[in-house]
């Protein structure tokens, strides 16, 4: 499976003469095709890589692992920013809803039980570890559904505008260092 072929660990997988590697480096997976689906406006994201972490990685392996997390999240963050932008334009009556749709975004994530595992856990291939991850994911999904099921089809459970306000951006009035 190409989705498990991290380029720094495994060779590309060849299928019908075409080489593939993990798509997280480009789009993991792309959200834009979901705009074409007319039966729902909901996008439920199962967040695996944290957007941010407490502390600063200090060792070379920890820094590389964090770079991978940031890389894997980059395309997702760009698409979420575009979804927020289109939604804001629709709310301001600057884009006609119909041709454009306001998407309802939801995020299932469980970072607390995984935090003690540290960064770089994506390289662990132990069966027991996968069973632990499965249990954590099942619990996260159950809790999310219990708390947010009624929001599906009605409203977003992620405040994208607040998410992007919280991300520091360069201050153009200050010189770069």
Each language-model region and where it sits:
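Patatin-like phospholipase
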Residues: 1-177
């Amino acid at each position: 499976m190409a989705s498990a072929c991290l380029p720094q660990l495994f060779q590309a997988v060849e299928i019908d003469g075409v080489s593939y590697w993990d798509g997280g480096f480009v789009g993991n997976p792309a959200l834009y095709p979901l705009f074409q689906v007319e039966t729902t406006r909901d996008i439920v994201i199962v967040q695996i890589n944290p957007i941010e972490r407490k502390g600063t990685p200090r060792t070379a392996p920890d820094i590389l692992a964090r770079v991978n997390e940031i890389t894997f999240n980059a395309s997702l963050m760009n698409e979420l920013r575009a979804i927020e932008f289109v939604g804001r334009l629709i709310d301001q009556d600057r884009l006609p809803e119909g041709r454009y749709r306001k998407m309802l975004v939801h995020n299932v994530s469980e970072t607390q039980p995984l935090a003690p595992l540290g960064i770089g856990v994506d390289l662990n291939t132990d069966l027991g570890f996968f069973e632990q991850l499965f249990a954590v994911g099942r619990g996260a999904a159950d809790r999310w559904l219990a708390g947010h099921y009624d929001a599906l089809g009605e409203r977003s459970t992620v405040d994208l505008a607040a998410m992007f306000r919280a991300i520091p951006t360069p201050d153009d009035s200050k010189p770069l260092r």
